[in-house]
Amino acid sequence: MESKNRAKLLVSVLAIVIAFAVFIKPLVSTVKQGLDLQGGTHVVLQAQETPESKVDDDAINRSIQIISRRVNELGLTEPVIQRQGKDKIIVELPGVKDPEQAIAMLGKTAMLEFKDMEGNTVLTGKDLKDSKASADQSGQPVVTLQFNEDGAKKFADLTARNVGRQIAILLDGKVLTAPRVSEPITGGNAQITGSKDAKEAEHLAILLRSGSLPVKLEVVENRTVGPTLGQDAKDASMKAFAIGLAGVFLFMLLYYRLSGLVADIVLLLYTLLLLAVMKGLNATLTLPGMAGIILSIGMAVDANVLIFERFKEEIANGKTLRAAVNSGFSRAFTTILDSNVTTLMAAAVLFYLGTGPIKGFAVTLALGVLISMFTAVTVTKFILGALIGSNFTKNPAWFGAKAFQPKAKDGKGEAAR
């Protein structure tokens, strides 16, 4: 039995330590990071009601879809686009190199119109099938338009009726170009000239491809975090995390000895599982989120403290180490459960009512609490039970506890004669 427990102890401890050493660095580097850690742009867009467009759920949802297409076309990785309230849209663009140009693209309505000399709108962006940036024969940047079947017929009719005359191509009411028609164009294609460079042509093509916004959007908040500032915040947070974790490890080891060592090893597993779950859920790690992780580590340690104190009380009452472990965990479980349920309720409220960073804090806190329930109770009990069952020592002092002292019959604390 002792050899079996020793094998359990050795395998479990080695598995945790090796897994931590192998996976901690890849997990830390691949967990999705928020703007405050890696830099980027945070924009809040507010829908503006006009006589032509009404702000409702459908308009906001369609706007989110169009903005998502524009952001994806820009090639930005892991953007965050979500609704806030009834008329606002939050857009977070991590690692964006040209925030001003990106912001300009996000809120641009991009209403394309083809008008004749009388001012009649003949075609709109709805008649487009595709748009691409390219260069003409002289090397100048242009945007090539491809119309859908209905649009091709309209464009052929427009050019046939206006040979020798100009037609205007407008974007959001501003004339982009006004070419003179030399002959009817029946191929279903057109070109927009006037872009100052290839980048501007590409952005115009993206706007036209993604479609026009159903409502006007105005930038009401714009915050940019530089990559250097984000890296500094990340480094400071990691340093604080490492110092705090080392302090907890040292305290548990000095005060609870072998029990504390078990708790420290389990904390390694806790940290690993938390990062793995965050990566699996594609959760974003922010500065408030790191605060939530540190707080949840404190709660995991608090659970161990409750268990170990009950464990010490049971030993002081004369129970064997194994009986004290079982009884200590049973007595502490209700208190731990109550505390964690209360924290989960608070995290749920923060997530429901909060936005952005507050939600990040709530998510990491809730995940940490749930994982700590598993590690602090189940894993700690398993390893501690294997340690005691291996008969490494029967001295309670090795577990930070005092040995049972029988009371004297006269109640004065002296041994009966």
Curated annotation (Swiss-Prot):
It is found in: Cell membrane. It comes from the Bacteria. HAMAP family: SecD_B (MF_01463_B). One of its GO terms (molecular function) is protein-transporting ATPase activity. Part of the Sec protein translocase complex. Interacts with the SecYEG preprotein conducting channel. SecDF uses the proton motive force (PMF) to complete protein translocation after the ATP-dependent function of SecA. Forms a complex with SecF. Part of the essential Sec protein translocation apparatus which comprises SecA, SecYEG and auxiliary proteins SecDF. Other proteins may also be involved. GO terms for biological process: intracellular protein transmembrane transport; protein targeting; protein transport by the Sec complex. It comes from Acidaminococcus fermentans (strain ATCC 25085 / DSM 20731 / CCUG 9996 / CIP 106432 / VR4). This is Protein translocase subunit SecD. Belongs to the SecD/SecF family. SecD subfamily. It is a multi-pass membrane protein. The chain crosses the membrane at residues 9-29, 236-256, 258-278, 288-308, 333-353, 360-380. The gene is secD. GO terms for cellular component: plasma membrane. Keywords: Cell membrane, Membrane, Protein transport, Translocation, Transmembrane, Transmembrane helix, Transport. InterPro entries: SecD (IPR005791), SecD/SecF_arch_bac (IPR022813), SecD/SecF_CS (IPR022646), SecD_1st (IPR048631), SecD_SecF_C (IPR048634), SecD_SecF_C_bact (IPR055344), SecDF_P1_head (IPR054384).
